[in-house]
Amino acid sequence: MITFEYRFDIVPGKTAEYEKYLKGQGKNIWTKYKGVKAVRKYKSMLGGSSPQRVVQVDLDSLASLERILSDPGFKKAKEKFHSLVTHVTDSLLISV
């Protein structure tokens, strides 16, 4: 199993649009794909720290992640996501 983790901030002034995205195009963006085992979403408790949001996606394999990232529907949703967020970083994690 692997964990794909990404961290980001919402672009100032785009919070309402981001919340709308989560209820529409971004809703269940990960869980609808085969190979996804769990999704965890976090918001920082420390005001002013960056990044403010963290998402962790557990997948059964790297192949599943690659398949999801190459899906046209996912790519379209990801493009919209990136128009609403900044300071995006990601990691691929395995347990030790």
Place the predicted regions along the sequence by residue.
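Short amphipathic alpha-helical segments
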Residues: 14-41, 73-81
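Compositionally biased amphipathic helical and low-complexity segments enriched in hydrophobic
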Residues: 23, 63, 93-94
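Glycine-rich beta-strand-turn "strand-cap" elements at beta-sheet edges
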Residues: 37-54, 77-96
